[in-house]
Amino acid sequence: MALRLVIAEKPSVAQTIAAALGVKGKQDGYIEGGGYLISWCVGHLVQLAEAAAYGEQYRKWQLDSLPILPEEWQYAVDPDKGKQFATLKELMHRTDVSEVVNACDAGREGELIFRFVYEVAGCKKPMRRLWISSMEDGAIKAGFASLKDGREYDALFASALCRAKADWLIGINATRLFSCLYGKTLNVGRVQTPTLKMLTDRDAAISHFQKEKYYHVRLDLSGAEAASERISDKAEADALKGACEAGKAVCVSFTREKKTAAPPKLFDLTSLQREANRIFGYTAKQTLDLAQALYEKQLLTYPRTDSSFLTDDMGDTAAGIITLLCEKLPFMAGVGFTPGIAKVLDSKKVSDHHAIIPTMELAKTELAALPESERNILTLAGARLLSATAEPHIFEAVTAVFSCAGTDFTARGKTVLSDGWKEIERRYRATLKSKPDPEDGENEGVTLPELSEGQSFEKPAAKVTEHTTTPPKPHSEASLLSAMERAGNGDTDPDAERRGLGTPATRAAVIEKLVKGGFAERKGKQLIPTQNGAALISILPDMLTSPQLTAEWESNLTQIAKGAADPGEFLSGIEAMARELVQTHAAALDGKKDLFREEKPSIGKCPRCGSPVHEGKKNYYCSNRECAFVMWKNDRFFEERKTAFSAKIAAALLKSGKANVKKLYSPKTGKTYDGTIVLADTGGKYVNYRIEVQKN
């Protein structure tokens, strides 16, 4: 009997697929039954090999070995995952296996994970592709009923392979180049470095910001407060105030304009991460991990998507989920809700996967039984589906302009005509433990009294209010994700192909690398570049730090995935950049050679030259290279007395020439005693010590 080998990205997904297909025979590293062998990768089982695989000369980080440009790329199995790779290879080569199904995540990285294993295992059997956006049993069965020819995804694999090779070429060469030049490991990445540049640019804008005072003159006109434009001079504002109080204000225009605020779009991954950061303070990685966990529990659709629409054939599915949400979510109790589902359906705006929404599995789940963080994300996605299909928010914007003392004053108001989707948002926000800061414009406007053109106010009450210009805010993960998403778009048509730094699936990992590498740090919800982060950006060329250039690469990778761009041409450009980097950066920048030199704490001053003394692994040494003063930790004097030469003892010797030490061992008597060690430096190659016995 011919068997079908199914390979998932991780064990939990393999188990879900097996359950949906009724496969129950657990074996070592796979599940068997019903004509299926279902196994799994454990993330990236196979990766591009390290530089040393291309020759011993690349084992050490040396400038003269750069650039490293492989002619034939090598691959390496993760040594910690070798057993599972061996299992997959054996299963692929079983004579009773007729075809292999790629059931890894339906996206660029999932394609790469499977293809690397398939290629390195030397498998030649036909490939099929499972491409689904939900882990519900019905979706899995439907996916297996309509498997695609794996070769239809060759362009997607080409894009993934180009991405991996580009990251390798830039990462290996730039990291080694600048690390050797500046004497410190400096991790440079194709996406992470321009992302760091965004943080340092914002930090610089804050540091260089000059606060300025400005003033408004405000008139009280029978319940309407009208304000002047900004006035930079206090005396000018005071003079205007006096003139107004002695004069007359006349309404020169009064307009009402009906406006509509459309409902928000459904979540793609980046917008979900932004909102979860703003509301709950979750990092981008935390949100992705939570969404992935919910996906694997069949409660949420595939999270790594860049689409905010559903396909045209999902109307009935969406309607069923909305009905379920109205029953399950407490804040919808008693709300009569008729969704406008058509506004979230648009197959033309769905690429690989549709927007993130809950699934019908919610019917079988008690929300209260979920971990709080997972419940928060699931409820957030549910609330967004309801808001996105609700009526628009309709309001009337009222503007009144008054003339007084030759100056215009403006009063603005807002009257809500229909809450629409904002009523759902308000109900949802009311359930949150901590209330997020309102978004720009959420609280704007007040109700103005009825006014008419020509209406006048004699000697109106006036006041001067003082204000200060505010600097830009540090990036939060929410704002940084937005900046990464918009990078390279410029003033292009909003419906044009988006570029951006990274992809929805990779942005969280980029941020984590910056934090773990010590180039950025979290302070509450803020992301701040560290001193090393700012220093790194200061030494790197624009070709490595430009968000626009990296966004163009990401756009090229998207075109390669569509079969519309040449992979070879793309990689040739990356290789040329690696060559140019090495050729144009043969030495450290003037004055910046010691930029990353860490100041070691001093334990005291050198008794010979007065320079700071530092602790090394084996000694305490003078920082002045011209001075020979050094105290060795394994000095025979201390070893004979069975006493560790600690930094505390060394500091005391440097400070006063003496250190009181308890329980010194006497080689003569075999007993211990308390004594004072005296530094007896003769200025020679070695430092001597002697004992002063403490008398009781």
Residue ranges and their predicted role:
Residues D137-L221, R256-T260:
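C-terminal or mid-to-C-terminal helical accessory/interaction module adjacent to the motor/catalytic core
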Residues P11-A18, G35-I38, V42, D78-K89, ...:
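Amphipathic alpha-helical transducer elements in NTP-driven molecular machines
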Residues A235-F267, Q273:
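Metal- or metallocofactor-binding catalytic centers and their adjacent structured scaffolds
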